[in-house]
């Protein structure tokens, strides 16, 4: 595409103007954007450093876990790797500032002055050449007018030829000047774009090297990192062995473990040195399913009829409420014994196990050590201090061992063994047994109560002890003493259920009491 000198001249001037009015201002804007880019990258590096410091802290937490130790080490390694990559990125952006931002700032200020001067010089030289050409053309016109109308035509003809050559020469010069000026302007523009591209290529080379290093580093570590987290349900073999040991312990608690007394928590706060169930559970048989035998002297002050009524009411209350009888009995036991730091008991009646291997045999006055502090349906589990035999025995056949009787300092026992009132009755050597006439009176009263519709007194087999106590009369203890749970065991008045019957004295001088 051919262009005239004027069009090429306009192209040259426009090229210079584009560099001054668009390229250089664009460089200034690029410098500002580059500085913002630097700030953003530096902020990103600082934020990344803080972030991966947090990752490392979480990794340290994971190293303390028995199943996540390896994952914790991986998190720490990921943190250190990314911080190293961020440090390398920071070094590359220092080169970005040095090679691009700094150079552009320096070149832009100088180039504005240079391009302005170059354009002015080109325009001035171009104007001078045009002026010379125009003068030569004007002289040529004058010569031609003179040669056409003058007498010395040959003389003017020779001068005309000289001016034509001068105009032609000056036209060639100005065309050459315009062409060279256009070429120079375009090259100046290209040099500036080349400079910008070259600087960014240099920075891109640094970034490429950074990414190559990062890729090589990550490719060497990433598969191992992924392997540690591929299965979240995998548990180390050591931990699995520990879990299996927990699932299948050496011993399991006995299914017939007595229910704890409501006072057990209070007792635990007072004494912590009694034996626990788990210590003896492997050798402990289940508690007997039948209710424990009742002490022969437990109901000696109760009227049989009223005792039967009281027993029936108690049983009905237990059935209605649906509570555990052992829990009710534990509540009814005197609280003073719960608070005593005892673990040994003394037998007040003999007991024979017979063919039942789960029961414990002992004689009167033997010392037993409680292995289970709680009571189950009137049964306690303990060890004979002399024979070292273990088994279940009725709690009513024992009493707490007094401090002056113990050989060593007793340990706390939260078990409600028996009411103090019962222990006092059985501990005294001189127990007053009602005379036969009193028994007959009781029998008559019981017979009259039966006729009146009173509840039937439990049979002797229900409350008879396995072994008859010494010095016992022919009358059955259970027939004389009534039910197994007298009211005075719950802390009430022991004579609250005793009724005064009409009595006639043999002394005629005494008044008749009705």
From Swiss-Prot:
Tissue: Detected in bladder, liver, testis, heart, lung, spleen, brain and skeletal muscle (at protein level).
Sequence ranges assigned to domain SH3 in this UniProt record: 340-403
Modified residues (Phosphoserine): 261, 281, 332, 413, 419, 421
Subcellular location, principal: cytoplasm
GO biological process terms held by the UniProt record: plasma membrane organization; positive regulation of actin filament polymerization; regulation of actin cytoskeleton organization
One Pfam family recorded for the sequence: IMD
UniProt entry keywords in alphabetical sequence: Actin-binding, Coiled coil, Cytoplasm, Cytoskeleton, Phosphoprotein, SH3 domain
Record domain IMD: where: 1-249
Compositionally biased residues, Polar residues: 471-481
Chain intervals for the UniProt region annotation (Disordered): 306-329, 449-514
GO cellular component terms attached to this protein's record: actin cytoskeleton; cytosol; nucleoplasm; plasma membrane
Coiled-coil blocks: 115-148
PTM: Phosphorylated on tyrosine in response to insulin.
Subunit details: Interacts with RAC1. Binds to F-actin. Interacts with FASLG.
Domain topic, free-text comment: The IMD domain is predicted to have a helical structure. It may induce actin bundling and filopodia formation.
Function: May function as adapter protein. Involved in the formation of clusters of actin bundles. Plays a role in the reorganization of the actin cytoskeleton in response to bacterial infection.
Protein name: BAR/IMD domain-containing adapter protein 2-like 1
Annotated organism of origin: Mus musculus
Lineage: Eukaryota, Metazoa, Chordata, Craniata, Vertebrata
Gene: Baiap2l1
